[in-house]
Amino acid sequence: LDITLENTTNKGRIDMAVRFNGNIYLFEFKVVEMVSEGKALLQLQSRGYAEKYRQFGEPIHLIGVEFSKDDRNIVAFDVESI
């Protein structure tokens, strides 16, 4: 198990990267007003955060989590495996 927080790339910072059991999980966390905006997963995709981890040859899972500012609860949890 290897966990890295605020992992820097040439295009920004990955909120959390986890290498576990032959898989890589990249997390982006966003706070939104009320409803899901899809920005967390979109940031992982558009900034190419997975490129830093392709060298390991392991499955990579992009996980976008959005929290409601008012409810302080998860309003979206999007996953894409690449």
Task: Please annotate each region the language model reported.
Residues 12-14, 25, 58, 63:
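Structural beta-strand/beta-sheet cores of well-ordered domains, especially the beta-sheet scaffolds
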Residues 5-8, 29, 40-42, 60, ...:
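Composition- and surface-driven signal marking solvent-exposed, interaction-prone regions
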Residues 32-50:
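Mg2+/Mn2+-dependent nuclease catalytic core
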Residues 9, 20, 31-33, 66-69:
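Short, flexible loop/turn elements at secondary-structure junctions
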Residues 16-18, 22-33, 47:
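Conserved catalytic cores of phosphodiester-cleaving nucleases, focusing on short active-site segments
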Residues 22-24, 37, 45-46, 75, ...:
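C-terminal, active-site-flanking charged/polar segments
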Residues 1-21:
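Active-site metal-binding core of divalent-cation-utilizing nuclease and nuclease-like domains
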Residues 52, 56-82:
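Domain-level recognition of nuclease-like catalytic cores that cleave nucleotide substrates
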